[in-house]
A protein has these predicted regions:
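Active-site-proximal, well-structured secondary-structure segments within enzyme catalytic domains
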Residues: 1-156, 213-262, 266, 277-280, ...
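Active-site rim elements
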Residues: 62-68, 161-169, 196-197, 246-250, ...
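Active-site recognition of the HExxH zinc-binding catalytic motif
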Residues: 79, 159, 167-187, 208
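Short, solvent-exposed loop/turn elements at beta->coil junctions and helix N-caps
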Residues: 90-95, 197-198, 303
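A short beta-turn/loop motif at secondary-structure boundaries
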Residues: 94-98, 180, 200
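C-terminal substrate/ligand-recognition segments
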Residues: 177, 251-270, 287, 291-296, ...
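Long, well-ordered alpha-helical segments
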Residues: 181-191, 217-222
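The catalytic-center signature of Zn2+-dependent metalloproteases
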Residues: 188-211, 216
Length: 313
C-alpha cells in the first residue's frame, strides 16, 4: 500500500504531461489536415513528428550512427576499460542454439584467465519471446566447482537484409547496453556458495541501468557511433540535440510504466482474488484515470514479469 501511495503521488503530474503531449500531437495532425483525434495507435507516429518539430531531430537521423556491430564493439570496449572484462569472439567454435547467435569468450584483460562464455542472440525470429532479457545458464560458485559463467543477452532487433548494415534506434541501443549491464554483473560475480550469487529483487535492475549511462558518453560515441556509410563520428550538434530532447515524451513513458505497476499492485492487493483479468484491468485503469490516448505498457495477458514464473509473482 505504501508503494501504491508513492506511485499515486507521481501519477497526476505524469497524466498532466501526457495531456500536453497529446495537445502537441493533435496540433500537428490538425495542421497537416488529418481529420483525426489522437488515439493510442497514433501516439508513436505523431510523437516523432513532434520530436522533429521541437528539436529538429528524428530517429532516422540517429540510426545512421548506431550500426549494431559497432555498438557491440563499443559495449565490450567499455566493459574492458571499466572492469577488465575482455570479450573475444569465438563464433563457430562452440555450439549455439540458433545460427544467428554469436559467441564470445570472456576473460580477465590483465591476467588472461578465462571466466565465461557469452551468447549474443540479437535478432527477432518466429517463436522467440518478445522483449529483451539476460540469462545465465551457469553461474560461478566455487563450492560446486563452477568457475566458468555461461550467459546470454537476448534482443529482438530487426535483422537487416543480406549485405545491408544493421542500424538501430537510440531506444534499441539503450536496451542493448541495458541488458549488457546484467551480463557484466553475472560475469563479475565471484562467490563460494550459490545462494550468495545473483542480487536482491530490489537491486536487480541497478547494474543494467548504470551501464546504460556509458552509451552517450563522448569516448564511446567518438569511437563507435560512426555513420554506417561514411564512417564519420556523430557530430556534436546531433549529440546536443539528443541531450536537449532527453525529457521528450516522458509523460508517455511514465504513464505506460506506472499504469502497469499500479494494475500489478492492485491485482495483488485484492483480498478476494481476481477472476476476470480483463474486467479488472479496465476497472482499475478507469479508477486511476488512464488517458484514453494511450495504453499501459504491459497488458495483463502478456505481462511476463507477473506470470512467467513463481519468482516474479
Amino acid at each position: 500500500e505504501a508503494a501504491t501511495a508513492l506511485m499515486m503521488r507521481v501519477w497526476p503530474a505524469a497524466v498532466a504531461r501526457v495531456k500536453e503531449e497529446v495537445a502537441d500531437m493533435q496540433a500537428i495532425a490538425t495542421t497537416e489536415g488529418a481529420n483525426i483525434t489522437i488515439e493510442p495507435w497514433d501516439y508513436r507516429f505523431y510523437q516523432e513528428k513532434v520530436r522533429k518539430a521541437k528539436y529538429d531531430l528524428s530517429q532516422d537521423e540517429i540510426k545512421r550512427y548506431f550500426e549494431l556491430n559497432n555498438l557491440v564493439k563499443g559495449m565490450f570496449w567499455s566493459a574492458e576499460q571499466l572492469y577488465d572484462l575482455k570479450f573475444t569472439e569465438n563464433t563457430g567454435k562452440v555450439p549455439v542454439f540458433q545460427p544467428d547467435v554469436r559467441t564470445f569468450e570472456v576473460s580477465n584483460a590483465k591476467t588472461g584467465e578465462v571466466t565465461g562464455l557469452f551468447y549474443l542472440d540479437t535478432y527477432a525470429r518466429k517463436g522467440k519471446r518478445s522483449g529483451a532479457w539476460a540469462t545465465t545458464y551457469r553461474s560461478r560458485a566455487h563450492l560446486l566447482g563452477d568457475k566458468i559463467v555461461i550467459g546470454s543477452n537476448n534482443n529482438n532487433f530487426t535483422k537487416p537484409a543480406p549485405g545491408q548494415p544493421g542500424v538501430i534506434s537510440l531506444n534499441d541501443a539503450e536496451t542493448l547496453w541495458h541488458e549488457f549491464g546484467h551480463a557484466i554483473h553475472y560475469y563479475l560475480s565471484d562467490v563460494n556458495y550459490p545462494s550468495l550469487g545473483g542480487s536482491p529483487r530490489d537491486f536487480v535492475e541497478y547494474p543494467s541501468q548504470v551501464n546504460e549511462n556509458w552509451l552517450m558518453t563522448r569516448p564511446v560515441l567518438d569511437k563507435f557511433a560512426r555513420h554506417y556509410e561514411t564512417g564519420a563520428a556523430m557530430p556534436e550538434e546531433l549529440v546536443e540535440k539528443i541531450e536537449a530532447s532527453e525529457t521528450f515524451n516522458q509523460g508517455f513513458a511514465t504513464v505506460e510504466y506506472l499504469s502497469s505497476a499500479l494494475v500489478d499492485m492492485k491485482l495483488h492487493l485484492d483480498p478476494n482474488g481476481v477472476v476476470n483479468p480483463d474486467a479488472f484491468e479496465k476497472k482499475t485503469l478507469a479508477e486511476i484515470g488512464m488517458p484514453k490516448e494511450m495504453v499501459m505498457r504491459h497488458r495483463l495477458p502478456q505481462f511476463g514479469h507477473l506470470f512467467s514464473s513463481d519468482a516474479y509473482s
